[in-house]
UniProtKB/Swiss-Prot annotation:
Assembly and interaction partners: Homodimer.
Cited Pfam families: Ham1p_like (PF01725)
Residues annotated as binding Mg(2+): 69
InterPro entries: dITP/XTP_pyrophosphatase (IPR020922), ITPase-like_fam (IPR029001), RdgB/HAM1 (IPR002637)
Organism (species): Syntrophotalea carbinolica (strain DSM 2380 / NBRC 103641 / GraBd1) (Pelobacter carbinolicus)
Recorded GO MF terms: dITP diphosphatase activity; ITP diphosphatase activity; metal ion binding; nucleotide binding; ribonucleoside triphosphate phosphatase activity; XTP diphosphatase activity
Lineage: Bacteria, Pseudomonadati, Thermodesulfobacteriota, Desulfuromonadia, Desulfuromonadales
Cofactor binding summary note: Binds 1 Mg(2+) ion per subunit.
CC cofactor: Mg(2+)
Function according to Swiss-Prot or TrEMBL: Pyrophosphatase that catalyzes the hydrolysis of nucleoside triphosphates to their monophosphate derivatives, with a high preference for the non-canonical purine nucleotides XTP (xanthosine triphosphate), dITP (deoxyinosine triphosphate) and ITP. Seems to function as a house-cleaning enzyme that removes non-canonical purine nucleotides from the nucleotide pool, thus preventing their incorporation into DNA/RNA and avoiding chromosomal lesions.
Protein name listed in UniProt: dITP/XTP pyrophosphatase
Length: 196
């Protein structure tokens, strides 16, 4: 089965490819389809943004399409950066810029109040417009400085208490198994392989 993953984010595409390695699903990114327009993520929720991206690209390409919107929600910041996670420090922000802004915004937050969660909503849409949503969540704590070299985004700052390591420090197989994206993708794959 072939599926378009509506992203140009190479880190995200690699993560999804690894998560689907043991399935019969072959993924392609947007770059495989030439000059497709960007979809403006103007929804108020992860679900709205994921659905809009998947439905638009499925219609334009005629392919079964999955899109996700995901991000970090920090309790002490009222759920920020939330849907703005990728551009928290500005539209052209790098991961390092976003991490720096998060640390600045949390500078006065004490150790026991740094709870956060990564959220992911995946939308699977057909070219005809039928869509299903799948979600995942990973709870953790934001550190005062980054640790680890792996992963991308906020991974170096996000401590997973059960492992005593950041997502950037965890072996890839563990990260993929427990991640918010991994959980959502597991639900999506189960749906694709369910009878009827």
């Amino acid at each position: 089965m072939e599926m378009l993953v509506a992203t140009r984010n190479k880190g995200k595409l690699r993560e999804i490819e690894r998560l689907l390695a043991d399935t019969d699903i072959v993924v392609k990114g947007l770059d495989a389809y030439g000059d497709l327009p960007d979809v403006v993520e103007d929804g108020a929720t992860f679900a709205a943004n994921a659905r809009k991206k998947a439905a638009t690209m499925a219609r334009l390409t005629g392919c079964l399409t999955v899109a996700d919107d995901s991000g970090l929600a920090v309790e002490a910041l009222g759920g920020k950066p939330g849907i703005y996670s990728a551009r928290y420090a500005g539209e052209e922000a790098l991961d390092s810029d976003n991490n720096r802004k998060l640390l600045e915004d949390m500078a006065s937050v004490p150790e026991g109040q740094r709870q956060a969660a990564f959220h992911c909503v995946m939308a699977l849409c057909t070219p005809e417009g039928d869509c299903q949503l799948f979600d995942g969540r990973l709870d953790g704590v934001i550190l005062t400085r980054g640790r680890g070299e792996g992963g991308f985004g906020y991974d170096p700052l996000f401590l997973v208490p059960e492992y005593g390591r950041t997502l950037a420090e965890l072996p890839l197989d563990i990260k993929n198994r427990i991640s918010h994206r991994g959980q959502a993708l597991k639900r999506l794959v189960a749906y694709l392989h369910s009878p009827g």
